[in-house]
Amino acid sequence: QMLDVADFDENSLERLVQELNQMFVVNINTIDKTKEILSRYGIKFIIVPKFDKTPIDGFSFWQGKNPTIVLTLRLNKIDNYAFALLHEIYHVYMHLFNNREQKYIAIEGAEINKCEEEANKFAKCSLIGKDLWNTFLKQHSMISPHAMQMKIKQFAHQHNINEAIVLGFYQ
């Protein structure tokens, strides 16, 4: 169903990321919840079937008064979903807002330009802070895979991050 989409507010990025991170932790009805949250922030959200020949995870563009984010669920796992979503959100706020003719498409294996690199970095840091992650890895560099699994569980719980997202980072 089409939701009413609010006006887009270019100063709401931090709030939006916090709200999405809460949603990733719970990870129930995630697609509907994403649509609902994004519409409140003035962003249209669409899921399309993955493309056969092209490894596209998502794309974003401006449509009328609002930005639109499209995800393909090519890799149907919460860590990929969260990353792809935050990647496109970064494009919306940092690139599309000032240049509405532009379109961004995330294709796996494509040559990475500065905009894509920035969006990747933002998505990663929004899910798990860089310093937090590096500290975790340093502390647990010498432990067995089984022990690491326990540490990942603890880390996820302690920092209120979805366990599968932490695991995705680790792999």
Regions found by a protein language model. Give the residues of each.
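Active-site hotspot residues in diverse enzymes, especially metal/ion-binding acidic/histidine motifs
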Residues: Q1-Q171
